[in-house]
Amino acid sequence: MKVYDEEIAKIKTQCQNGVPLFIDRAWESVKKEELLLRMDAALELGGSGLPAVGALGFTTDASLVEETKHTLIGEELAACSMDQPYARITLLRLNEKMIRKAEEEKSLYLLLRDMEYVRYRLHLKGCLLRVSSAKEREVLRISKQAVADGISFAGIAKAYEAAYRSFPQVEAVQTIFVTEPAFAYDKLRTSARRMEQITQSFEHIYESLTMDCSQCGSKAVCDEIEGLRALHFAQVKKGGSGA
C-alpha cells in the first residue's frame, strides 16, 4: 500500500522537529463517552475556531513508519492554555501480506474505516472528543480533574496505540501531536484532507465496475495519486472475470 506515502512523507518532513514522548502508562479509558461541559473543562484544544486537525494515514513502508513512537510539537497539556490550536496525526504501518489479502477479498475499505473508528470507540476519562471528518477537524476538551490527575499527551498516545494494536494488521503506530501556535496547520490539513480522499476512493474502487474514468467520482484523486487508478482497474478486471 503506497497510495498514502506521498502525504505521509510530507507530514514527516513538516513534523520532523517533534520531541519524543516517553510513556510509562496509558491514560485510563471508560466504557461510555462522558458529558463534559465547557465550564468544567480546563482545556479545549482546537476549539473557538482555532486550527484543529485530525488525520490517519496508512503505509506498508517501514522506511516511513519505522517503529512505534509518539512525538509532540509545542507544549504538553500541563502548560497549555484553555483555547489552543491542536493537531493529532496517526500513522500506521500495516502488514503487507495481510493488506494484500484484504485487497483480494475486497475488504480493505472496511478494514481501514474500522481502524479509523477507533477514535469514536475509545473514550478517555475526563475527555470529550468532537470530530468533523468532513473537515478533518478534531477538537479535544479535557476536564479540570483530568489535568489535576496528570493527563498527558504521552498517556493519550499510549491509549490509542493499544487500541490500534488490537488489529493484527498493525505493525507500528506513530502519533504526532501539535500545539505550537505558529505551526503551519493549513499544510497539515491539506495532507489530512488528501488522505481522507484516498480512503474514500477505496469504497468506490471496490464497489464500482466502470472503467470509464470520465464517469468516476474518484477521477480527481486518481489523476494525482500514483497507484490508485491501477488498483481500480485491477479490481474491475477481477469483478468482470468473476473473481
Predicted features, each with a name:
Residues K12, E34-D40, E44, H70-E96:
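Long, solvent-exposed non-transmembrane regions
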